[in-house]
């Protein structure tokens, strides 16, 4: 598993290549001032952003669109037409976990249920899709486990992969 930790002037961004086509991000601002984070990702990925603590804002298209995500809420973003690189601002003492999954990988996980997933059904195929959602208790438990990650380094990749799959099945 490839892990990168990037200390920005304020805040920390950790990214983990969990599996082919799946990236897990942990954005943490434990400072007393607002922190900004950027992460390049192509348009072939679905973005799930979960605000665990505090509040955040995701800006796209040179700041023309912004999506606030407050504690215990999430946003799903998919735009097959335009690149959506991540440009996030986190308020002080905030934590956001993100799962970036390629559309190909997502389809392979849910091919039998594709018609039940609103943005994968035939009517929406190829269209952009944005959805905000309050986190339920089961999803919150999984996200808190992912944030804590108290497993041995040799098992870390397997643990994150299992948690991402669990998270996707609950979402």
Give the role of each language-model region.
Residues 3-117:
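N-terminal regulatory/effector-sensing and dimerization cores
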Residues 167-171:
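Hydrophobic recognition helices of helix-based DNA-binding modules
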Residues 74, 85, 127, 165-166:
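Residue-level detector of solvent-exposed, low-hydrophobicity positions
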Residues 118-163:
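Amphipathic alpha-helical segments enriched in hydrophobic/aromatic residues interleaved with Lys/Arg
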């Amino acid at each position: 598993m490839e892990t990168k930790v990037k200390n920005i002037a304020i805040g920390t961004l950790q990214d983990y290549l969990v599996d082919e086509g799946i990236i897990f991000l942990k954005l943490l601002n434990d400072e007393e001032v607002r922190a900004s984070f950027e992460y390049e990702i192509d348009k072939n990925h679905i973005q799930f952003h979960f605000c665990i603590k505090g509040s955040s804002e995701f800006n796209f298209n040179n700041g023309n669109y912004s999506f606030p995500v407050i504690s215990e809420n999430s946003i799903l973003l998919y735009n097959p037409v335009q690149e959506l690189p991540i440009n996030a601002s986190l308020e002080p003492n905030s934590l956001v976990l993100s799962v970036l999954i390629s559309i190909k990988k997502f389809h392979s996980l849910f091919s039998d249920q594709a018609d039940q997933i609103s943005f994968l059904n035939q009517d929406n195929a190829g269209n952009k899709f944005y959805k905000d959602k309050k986190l339920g208790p089961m999803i919150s438990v999984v996200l808190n486990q992912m944030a804590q990650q108290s497993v041995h380094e040799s098992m870390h990749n397997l643990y994150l992969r299992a948690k991402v799959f669990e998270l996707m099945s609950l979402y």
